[in-house]
Amino acid sequence: DLGLLSFDEPFKNLLTQGMVLKDGSKMSKSKGNTVDPDEIFENFGADTARLFILSDSPPARDFDWSDAGVEGCYKFLNRVWRLVSENQNYITKDYKIEFPLKCENDDLVRTVHMAIKGITNDIANDFQFNTVISKYRELTNAIYDWRGKKSDFTDEDKNVFSFAVLT
């Protein structure tokens, strides 16, 4: 606070957002370059639209709306859904991580903890939602890589997988 006002600011933090552009120009009804949200929701779902808006660029910068970017977010959400749905027999809410772990399991647990730390920092301190989503994509890739090396699941594997997926 610079002390220029005789009263307290009405908020502690302010996040100003950039403009959404279409083909390099500000979206505008008069220009006819808007995106119909109903069409996006119908074709891809509201979660896809939200993910794309948050993932495309830092919130303070302008970003160019891209149908390819929307499709990429849709594919990513489906990839996460498949990871969970195809492996639901290995997921339990009552998981318990007991150390020491096998090396590959220890690596995944470490990766999850690093993602938690980075995501928490990016949300709490920097409002960098695009990097949060990037870290979540990296974590999803790490879980897929770990899962691809497993033919059978031990109890330890189930607990580690549950921890990674439910986190």
Residue ranges, per PLM feature:
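Amphipathic alpha-helical
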Residues: V165-T167
